[in-house]
Amino acid sequence: MAALPDKEKLLRNFTRCANWEEKYLYIIDLGQRLAELNTQDRNPQNRIQGCQSQVWIVIGRNADGIIELQGDSDAAIVKGLMAVVFILYHHMTAQDIVHFDVRPWFEKMALTQHLTPSRSQGLEAMIRAIRAKAATLS
């Protein structure tokens, strides 16, 4: 995830975009920076229910107890939103993820107001799935 910005830089970059077209392009760019997900990880166990698009998220834990997230989607915007979520949860333990509320960050970005209802539901489904999987690891 080295190619992705940290939380603060994400917010700065996002607010520097002149309009929502630029913001959507930035979100898509973030999604393109995610590492490729292995074909074997695109399975029903890793598929996120509640998303209109196909979404897979894999959660692992490194030797230091830090959660590592990988994922993919067949929709560019959704993959970009996934990258935003991964940035917000970067360098956290499972317990940190369970207790961290991403919604204030979305509010700072005015993100949820500019998503279609189906994308907002999909974003919530991704967050719920990550938190639920993290809870089993904490």
Curated annotation (Swiss-Prot):
GO cellular component, one term: cytoplasm
Pathway as given in its UniProt record: Cofactor biosynthesis; iron-sulfur cluster biosynthesis
Pfam families tied to this protein: SufE (PF02657)
Chief location of this protein within or outside the cell: cytoplasm
Keyword Cytoplasm: yes
Disulfide bonds: none
GO biological process, one term: iron-sulfur cluster assembly
Subcellular location: Cytoplasm
Signal peptide: none
Residues annotated as catalytic: C51
Keyword tags: Cytoplasm
HAMAP family: SufE (MF_01832)
Known role: Participates in cysteine desulfuration mediated by SufS. Cysteine desulfuration mobilizes sulfur from L-cysteine to yield L-alanine and constitutes an essential step in sulfur metabolism for biosynthesis of a variety of sulfur-containing biomolecules. Functions as a sulfur acceptor for SufS, by mediating the direct transfer of the sulfur atom from the S-sulfanylcysteine of SufS, an intermediate product of cysteine desulfuration process.
Family label: Belongs to the SufE family.
Subunit: Homodimer. Interacts with SufS.
Protein name, as recorded: Cysteine desulfuration protein SufE
Species of origin: Salmonella arizonae (strain ATCC BAA-731 / CDC346-86 / RSK2980)
Taxonomic path: Bacteria, Pseudomonadati, Pseudomonadota, Gammaproteobacteria, Enterobacterales
